[in-house]
């Protein structure tokens, strides 16, 4: 919930950079998961939810304009 509040304060450009960072992080976590080195599997779910939240906010900001 804290992340969503922080995402709402950002502008469109910052949301895109945040989305790219989250996608990279998701990729890295997936690679760690496949190789068996992932110590905290809950992070996959957390990152996936954050990606969905950022995408939803980007869509809503585009509808407003």
UniProtKB/Swiss-Prot annotation:
It comes from the Bacteria. One of its GO terms (cellular component) is ribonucleoprotein complex. Keywords: Ribonucleoprotein, Ribosomal protein. PROSITE patterns: RIBOSOMAL_L29. One of its GO terms (molecular function) is structural constituent of ribosome. One of its GO terms (biological process) is translation. Signal peptide: none annotated. It holds the Pfam family Ribosomal_L29. CDD domains: Ribosomal_L29_HIP. Coiled coil: none annotated. The keyword Cytoplasm does not apply. SUPFAM superfamilies: Ribosomal protein L29 (L29p) (SSF46561). Belongs to the universal ribosomal protein uL29 family. This is Large ribosomal subunit protein uL29.
